[in-house]
From Swiss-Prot:
Top class in the EC scheme: transferase
UniProtKB keywords: Cytoplasm, Metal-binding, NAD, Transferase, Zinc
Note on cofactor: Binds 1 zinc ion per subunit.
InterPro entries: DHS-like_NAD/FAD-binding_dom (IPR029035), NAD-dep_sirtuin_deacylases (IPR050134), Sirtuin (IPR003000), Sirtuin_cat_small_dom_sf (IPR026591), Sirtuin_class_III (IPR027546), Ssirtuin_cat_dom (IPR026590)
Residue numbers binding NAD(+): 22-41, 104-107, 189-191, 215-217, 233
Lineage: Bacteria, Thermotogati, Deinococcota, Deinococci, Thermales
Name of the protein this chain belongs to: NAD-dependent protein deacylase
Deacetylase sirtuin-type domain span: 1-250
Documented EC number(s): 2.3.1.286
Domain of life, source organism: Bacteria
Gene Ontology MF term list: histone deacetylase activity, NAD-dependent; NAD+ binding; protein-malonyllysine demalonylase activity; protein-succinyllysine desuccinylase activity; zinc ion binding
Family named by the database record: Belongs to the sirtuin family. Class III subfamily.
CDD domains for this protein: SIRT5_Af1_CobB
Length: 254
């Protein structure tokens, strides 16, 4: 309990906050994770669906899988953990601080919840990217895969980062800078196994940030964390960011 109180106090006083989220934060919204016992990679081989080589071999198969995932995402809604991070951003910015949320998720739920200072490190399922001209465009509610580019008419691919691909231009630099400069770093719902995102917590710790981890299972970050909340994202965020009387009166975190 002492450590939790210390973490709350540090968060209240923090001026530069960086947050990393993974699949665990969207699990309560009904979005499958990848690596736990019920995760996507238990039933699907990532080499068959999430690599440039898989797409080159069988784009129809890959698009059919992504169309299924897109449908799951469109049915999902942000959960209290997403909204808690929106509220945290509001609090930090209202006192003149800086805030950046970096997510490995491609479901778009952080943006839907209202997060503003956001880096989608691995792209977004609800967008496509032209294979020829590189134009990114939102996918319509109903589309027959594969979609085609509205600018040049060429076939488009999912606008996500596959295994073996580079991150979106500028995304990593922005994320790395925020964690290197943070005085408080929060890592929520990630196994901390996928690089380079997994290194962000280590970067923050090495730079002197107070590091908090929220995850049901231990991760490689656990030995470094000043506080590890061994619980789910919704419960962990409620512990870390309880509503103030003012927030309750104004309807924040509802």
């Amino acid at each position: 309990m002492e450590r939790l109180e210390e973490a709350r106090k540090r968060l209240e006083e923090a001026r530069r906050v960086a947050v990393l989220t993974g699949a665990g934060i969207s699990k309560p919204s009904g979005i499958p994770t990848f690596r736990d016992a019920e995760g996507l990679w238990k039933n699907f081989n990532p080499l068959d669906y999430a690599t440039p080589e898989a797409y080159a071999r069988d784009p129809e198969k890959v698009w059919a899988w992504y169309a299924w995932r897109i449908q799951k995402v469109r049915e999902a809604k942000p959960n209290p953990a997403h909204y808690a991070l929106v509220e945290l951003e509001r609090r930090i910015l209202s006192r003149g601080g800086s805030f950046l949320l970096v997510t490995q998720n491609v479901d778009g739920l952080h943006a839907l919840a209202g997060s503003q200072n956001l880096v989608e490190l691995h792209g977004n399922l609800l967008r496509a990217r032209c294979e020829a001209c590189g134009k990114r465009f939102p996918l319509p509610e109903a589309f027959a895969p594969p979609p085609f580019c509205p600018a040049c008419g060429h076939r488009a691919r999912p606008d996500v980062v596959w295994f073996g691909e580079f991150l979106p231009e500028g995304a990593w630099e922005r994320a790395e800078r925020a964690f290197a400069e943070a005085d408080f770093a929060l890592v929520v719902g990630t196994s901390a196994e996928v690089e380079p995102a997994a290194s962000l917590g280590r970067i923050a710790f090495a730079s002197g940030a107070y590091l908090v981890e929220v995850n049901p299972e231990p991760t490689p970050l656990t030995p470094l964390a000043h506080l590890s909340l061994r619980t789910g994202a919704v419960e962990g965020m409620a512990l870390l960011l309880p509503p103030s009387p003012e927030d309750q009166a104004e309807g924040h975190l509802s």
